[in-house]
């Protein structure tokens, strides 16, 4: 009964920050993820706008008590249609953007709220039933995002703002500096922590852990010839271990 009362009090407690602060955190995360994906300042700006748009609409849908499945469908749609319109306008203006980076940024923002990592953590810590439920939920919501993106592509084609063919090779990053890309990871992690109403000490710890992983990846492992798969795995283990110890 005591535990149930504590949970009820936590659920009824007001958030520590206003809603616009959370939206700003998501925008910061979207801007930073665009940098990590190789975008420039314009792509970063579009990523921030897209993230804010997705979260604002999802917040409104949450107030209407719509299931989160539909949040993912609409979020995938909103990640695609604006990027197609931005691409069409940029082409007419004589400049260029990479719409796939904007779409990927929106997808990352949506995936950040899923429970895949939590399901794996439950499995590792001996809670297989909860892990199975959360894993199925993550798969279901991922399918909803894919459906939203597919629908957005079809609508963009109908509006005459079709997307370019997908490149088989990722574009050259606009910022090659290991420090800049590491800081992109720092701002992405800190933005997400702020978006989910973490306290200031938790945000600082999140940023420090992200810098440890990002700097190790971009400044140590990759320059010395480590494979991307091994580097990603090692940094993920480092971040997970550091986060667990700090928590």
Predicted regions and their residues:
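Alpha-helical transmembrane segments and their membrane-interface boundaries
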Residues: 2-247
């Amino acid at each position: 009964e005591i535990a149930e009362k504590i949970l009820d009090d936590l659920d009824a407690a007001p958030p520590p920050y206003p809603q616009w602060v959370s939206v700003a955190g998501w925008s910061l995360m979207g801007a930073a993820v665009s940098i990590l994906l190789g975008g420039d300042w314009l792509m970063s700006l579009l990523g921030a706008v897209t993230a804010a748009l997705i979260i604002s609409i999802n917040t409104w849908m949450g107030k209407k008590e719509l299931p989160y499945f539909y949040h993912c469908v609409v979020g995938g749609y909103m990640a695609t249609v604006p990027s197609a319109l931005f691409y069409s306008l940029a082409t007419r203006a004589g400049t260029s953007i990479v719409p796939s980076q904007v779409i990927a940024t929106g997808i990352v923002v949506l995936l950040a709220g899923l429970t895949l990592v939590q399901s794996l953590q439950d499995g590792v810590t001996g809670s297989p039933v909860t892990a199975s439920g959360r894993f199925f939920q993550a798969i279901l919501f991922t399918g909803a995002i894919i459906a939203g993106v597919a629908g957005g592509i079809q609508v963009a084609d109908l509006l005459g703002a079709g997307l370019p063919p997908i490149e088989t090779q990722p574009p050259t990053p606009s910022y090659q500096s290991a420090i800049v890309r590491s800081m992109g990871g720092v701002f992405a992690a800190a933005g997400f922590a702020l978006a989910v109403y973490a306290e200031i000490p938790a945000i600082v710890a999140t940023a420090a852990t992200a810098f440890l992983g990002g700097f190790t990846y971009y400044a140590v492992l990759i320059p010395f010839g480590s494979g991307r798969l091994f580097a990603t795995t090692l940094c993920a283990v480092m971040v997970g271990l550091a986060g667990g110890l700090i928590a």
